[in-house]
Amino acid sequence: MKNIGFVSTRIAGTDGVSLETYKWYQILQRNGYECYFFAGELETPPDRSFLEPKAHFDEPEIKHIYDECFGTTTRDRSVSRKIHELTSLIKTRLYEFCDHFDIDIIIPENALAIPLNIPLGMAVTEFVAETGIPAVAHHHDFSWERKRFLINAVQDYLQYAFPPLLESLRHVVINSEASRQLSYRRGISNTVVPNVFDFANPPTSSRKIKRLREELGFDEDDLFVLQPTRVVPRKWIERAVELVSLLDIKKRRLVVSHESGDEGDVYPRRILEYAGRLGVDVIYMGDKVGSSRSFHTNSDKKYTIDDVYQSADLVTYPSGYEGFGNAFIEAIYFKKPIMVNRYSIFVEDIEPCGFNVIPFEGFVTKKIADRILQSLAHDQLAAMLDENYELGKKYFSYEVLEKRLLPVIESFR
C-alpha cells in the first residue's frame, strides 16, 4: 500500500485539471493506493485534504506576483523577495502535508507546467529536490503554449521549475505535441497519457430530459444544439453561433452548459451581441448545471452535465485550441453527433482513431450546416454513434489510463 499526494492550485469545480485529477484518483484507489490532496481550494474528502490558501492562483499575494511578472521583462526586487518568502512558506506546508498523511509519492497537477502560481511551482521543485520523494508531474498545458506568458520577467523561474528536471521526477503530458515540445525545449523524457472517460460504464438514462428541454423552450421536434464548454475566447463559440444561424430549423438556439470561469464577462457578452445580429438565441445555463463525475457532485444544482448531454441532439466543438478535448470525448460517451473544428491536437491524436464526426476547417459554411441535418436524419446514425462509443472505449477509457499510468507509478519500486 502506498499513499499518494496530489498537489495543485485547486482541486474543485469542473475545470479540466480537477476533472482529470478525479479520474486519476479513481484509478489509483481501485488499484490499492490511498490518495490525499494539497491545494488552495479543495472539494475533496475532508479527511484526505490539506488546505493551503497560498497555493491558489487567485490568492491576493499570488495574484499580485502574477500581475507584476507577466506582460513586462523586468521585476522589482520586492517581487523577487516575496516569491522566495512564499516559496519557503508553501514548501514548509508541503513537508507538513507529507508528514501528516505519510505520503510516498506526490503528483503535482499542472503545478509544474503553467506558472499561475510561481511560488507553488518553486516550492514543489525544491521539496522534490530536497527529499528525493518519487513524483509524477501531470502537465496539462505549458507556459510556451499560451500568449499571455510569452512576455515575462521570470524566465529564470520558468527554467527552474516549469517544469524542472529532477532525478526522482517523472513527467506525464496529455498530447503528442506537448511531448515533443517538452523533449525539445527541456530535454525531458515523458509519457503521453490522454484524457479519458469511463466507457466501461455506459451512462444511465436521465429522468430530467423532458423537463430540461421544456424549461429551455424546446418542443419535442426542435433541434437542441449544445456547446458543452466554458465561455472563453479559445473555444471559438462564434463558429457554433454561425452554424445555428445557417441551420434550416424552426428555433435557432444554442445552449451553453458551462460558465465563463476565471476570464471575465467580456467574451460572454460579445457572444450574446454577435448571436443577436445573426438571429440566434444563446442560452447560458452554467448556473444550473453541476458535475456528477467529480469530487463534489453539486447536489445544489438543478441539473448535471449528464442531463444536459442526454437532452441534446447535436454537440458543437469549434475550439481553436485545446490541450486535448474533454468535451469531444464526453460527446462520444453520450453518443451524440458532434461538429468539431480540426484543431491541431484533434488532428494528430484523436482524428486518426477513426471517429465518425462532422469536421470543419476554421470556418462554418451552409454546406456544413446542410451536411449536419442530413447526418441527423441518416438511418444509420445510431449505428455510427455506437461505433464511436466502441472507439472511445478502445482509445480513451479508464482501462487505457490504467495501462499507461500504473507503470509510471510502479517504476519507483
List each model region and its residues.
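A conserved catalytic-core segment of Leloir-type glycosyltransferases
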Residues: I27, Y36-I105, V289-G290
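A short, active-site helix/loop in glycosyltransferases that binds the activated sugar's phosphate group
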Residues: N152-V192, F197-R207, R270
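Conserved donor-binding/catalytic core segment of Leloir-type glycosyltransferases
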Residues: R213-E214, F218-K235, V241-V244, L254-H258
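Nucleotide-activated donor-binding/catalytic signature segment of Leloir-type glycosyltransferases, i.e.
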Residues: D265-D307, G354
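Aromatic "clamp/platform" in nucleotide-sugar-dependent glycosyltransferases that forms part
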Residues: G320
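Short hydrophobic beta-strand element within catalytic cores of glycosyltransferases
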Residues: P337-N341, V357-I358
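A charged, aromatic-enriched C-terminal amphipathic alpha-helix characteristic of glycosyltransferases
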Residues: L376-E410
